[in-house]
């Protein structure tokens, strides 16, 4: 999508924010898993559009022991290859730095993946294989 001017960008952002809030409000009225799944997919798309992301994921714990994660929902922009099938039962040992931050309820923001190559080598490798350059 080619944006012509700043006003158009603000309109897109405003519409995406409205969609995000609307999808969140619908969660209180969900009657079954299929409906929840549809709302989550719409919400991920709106978040992707709002942030300009290529992909938006949701991960859940794979086991009660919380030793691995699986990608349960994914939205991808046009012409972006889905990774959901490759992101199943990922051992938390592949992301030790992130797990510490998650436990402290910290947000992870990576503006430039290459800047994490030496400080977070495990996470770097995990993201590099998916051709991810930045992450929130």
Regions found by a protein language model. Name each.
Residues 99-108, 115-119:
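Soluble sensory domains of the PAS superfamily and closely related sensory modules
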Residues 57-105:
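GAF sensory/regulatory domain recognition
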Residues 133-136:
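A short, aliphatic-rich beta-strand micro-motif
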Residues 1-39, 49:
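Signal-transmission linkers at sensory-effector interfaces
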């Amino acid at each position: 999508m080619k944006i012509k001017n700043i006003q158009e960008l603000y309109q897109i952002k405003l519409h995406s924010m409205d969609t995000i809030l609307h999808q969140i409000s619908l969660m209180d009225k969900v009657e079954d898993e299929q409906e929840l799944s549809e709302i989550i997919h719409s919400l991920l798309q709106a978040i992707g559009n709002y942030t300009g992301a290529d992909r938006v994921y949701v991960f859940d714990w794979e086991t009660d022991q919380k030793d691995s994660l699986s990608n349960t929902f994914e939205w991808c922009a046009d012409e972006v290859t889905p990774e959901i099938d490759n992101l199943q039962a990922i051992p938390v040992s592949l992301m030790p730095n992130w797990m510490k931050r998650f436990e402290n309820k910290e947000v992870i923001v990576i503006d430039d993946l290459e800047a994490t190559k030496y400080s977070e080598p495990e996470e770097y490798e995990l993201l590099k294989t998916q051709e991810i350059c930045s992450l929130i």
